[in-house]
Amino acid sequence: SPWITCLETHPLRTSTVLAHIRHATHGAITLENTQPFVRELWGRVHVFAHNGDLGSNLSHGSVAAPRYRAIGETDSEAAFCLLVERLVAGVDPARVDAGDVIFETFAAFAREMRERGPANIIYASNGRLLLHADRRTQAPGVIEPPGLWLLERHCSDGATVAVAGEGVHVAGVGVDVALVASVPLTGERWRPLEQGSVLQLEYGRVRRTERV
């Protein structure tokens, strides 16, 4: 892929990476329908990726005048806009418990989306990554768990480890890394996540886990 060449030739560094390969179930194959989706809230970047099918009738429900509207045609972007609207309505970012309220808002949102269809969701902002594991289409064509897999690594001092294949590597001094994917990307011991699991990851570690 040309993207691999770009990553190999440009020394990009970040603490959070979201990558998404889309099987287009809703909307045309266009840039505006390409994940991950990004919005601004509270002066921060919020990023969202979804794997599954939530149907085509998502709406903002009780939100009378939604601030966040989809640019493209996908169910995933419509769901993201709905999540951001609920964060606006329910979270005061200045409160000391804002992180807990964000987690609870995300968990309730994910549970609702799961009732519509497969809802494997990753949402990240301000160094915090939240995810909801559901079900997905497996190799035999059956929709069932697991929808996401987790691998936790500790990179020893000065070590550089390939995430999967070439192009993306994890390096640092005593760095903890958490990798989440639809399927295991390496031969290591990936852990399947139970359906309904909501996890909060920070600095490469799982900080909170709940079932919803």
Model-identified regions with their sequence ranges:
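Conserved short alpha-helical segments that host acidic/polar catalytic motifs at enzyme active sites
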Residues: 1-50, 54-212
